[in-house]
Amino acid sequence: MSDCIFVFQIPFIVYSKLDQWIFGNILCKIMSVLYYVGFFSNMFIITLMSIDRYFAIVHPIKRQPYRTKRIGILMCCSAWLLSLILSSPVSKLYENIPHMSKDIYQCTLTNENDSIIAFIKRLMQIEITILGFLIPIIIFVYCYYRIFSTVVRLRNRRKYKSIKIVLMIVVCSLICWIPLYIVLMIATIVSLYTSNIFRHLCLYLNLAYAITFSETISLARCCINPIIYTLIGEHVRSRISSICSCIYRDNRIRKKLFSRKSSSSSNII
């Protein structure tokens, strides 16, 4: 679902990066909030997936009473609700601002720097750092350390296959998100502290291009996840191979029928 949110946002992100925002101030705020909702929800969902794999392999008996469809839906809805709550302050940070010319607008961080805006920037910095990265990464490391220790000890190949997809999704998500996280951290620090050191840092790093590049990498994750499911998931691979075998078999049957018709027509002649 978080991948669908990012795919839906791509046209709006393009308009924003081209400094040709034509959708008004309200939609600017909505798209900005949705961007962070997608970020937090992605991290929370893959964290829940890692915890689920941890209990399934390390504590399979303890997990059984809690592995129900109702609890799964409740946990996912809680992750999305928490993502929305954490992202809602972003609506105060982004504005539809005239850029260069009065006829051209840009959906970007507001130029205002009052106490409320400064507090929200610090709040988002803390949220992204602690809730968006540090806590999920600690959970990932602990869960997969215990999982691999258990799999190696039990020498259970089937359980190793069951965690392979989840681990690949987690690793790809981290690789795609970490560059954007670093750039956003630098941008937040630059916007909060306007000393000469950070002004020169902003000048030399050219944060606008860095943010665009890191956002492109983060959006690439939406394309990588289906490839992971296709290449690693045995169920998906078996379905694809069965479809391909059916197509191949149908083509062979058609060729045989065509050759028989050709031979019969030649005999008649």
Curated annotation (Swiss-Prot):
It is a multi-pass membrane protein. Keywords: Disulfide bond, G-protein coupled receptor, Host cell membrane, Host membrane, Membrane, Receptor, Transducer, Transmembrane, Transmembrane helix. It is found in: Host cell membrane. The keyword Coiled coil does not apply. Signal peptide: none annotated. Disulfide bonds join 28-107. Coiled coil: none annotated. It holds the Pfam family 7tm_1. GO terms for biological process: calcium-mediated signaling; cell chemotaxis; immune response; positive regulation of cytosolic calcium ion concentration. The chain crosses the membrane at residues 30-50, 71-91, 123-143, 165-185, 200-220. GO terms for cellular component: host cell plasma membrane; membrane. InterPro entries: CCR1-9-like (IPR050119), GPCR_Rhodpsn (IPR000276), GPCR_Rhodpsn_7TM (IPR017452). The keyword Transmembrane applies. GO terms for molecular function: C-C chemokine binding; C-C chemokine receptor activity. Belongs to the G-protein coupled receptor 1 family. PANTHER family: C-C CHEMOKINE RECEPTOR TYPE 8, CELL ADHESION MOLECULE. This is G-protein coupled receptor homolog C3. It comes from Swinepox virus (strain Kasza).
